[in-house]
Amino acid sequence: MKNLIAELLLKLAQKEEESKELVAQVEALEIIVTAMLRNMAQSEQQMLIRQVEGALEGVKPDASVPDHDTELLRQYVKKLLRHPRH
């Protein structure tokens, strides 16, 4: 029983570490996208935003991906492009 609990705690710690790494990656990408958008002329920003949104519209997610997840991704991309971090 103690071994089982120890294994579960170890797996939980590994998952938590993986989660932290993913959060760090997402935050790094947000910072990069924000910096890039800030250094672009307004017309270039709008062109990039239209291209990204157009690319998203053309993507058909796999049937195994829940609609909620797809919508969450679309909303997050829109938020990042239209209202970047300050």
From Swiss-Prot:
Main location: cytoplasm
Keywords per UniProt: Coiled coil, Cytoplasm, Stress response
Subcellular location: Cytoplasm
Superkingdom of origin: Bacteria
Coiled coil: 1-47
Pfam families in UniProt: Anti-adapt_IraP (PF10796)
CC terms in the record's Gene Ontology section: cytoplasm
UniProt GO BP: cellular response to starvation
Subunit: Interacts with RssB.
UniProt record similarity statement: Belongs to the IraP family.
Function: Inhibits RpoS proteolysis by regulating RssB activity, thereby increasing the stability of the sigma stress factor RpoS especially during phosphate and magnesium starvation, but also in stationary phase and during nitrogen starvation. Its effect on RpoS stability is due to its interaction with RssB, which probably blocks the interaction of RssB with RpoS, and the consequent delivery of the RssB-RpoS complex to the ClpXP protein degradation pathway.
Listed HAMAP family: Anti_adapt_IraP
Protein name: Anti-adapter protein IraP
Organism: Salmonella arizonae (strain ATCC BAA-731 / CDC346-86 / RSK2980)
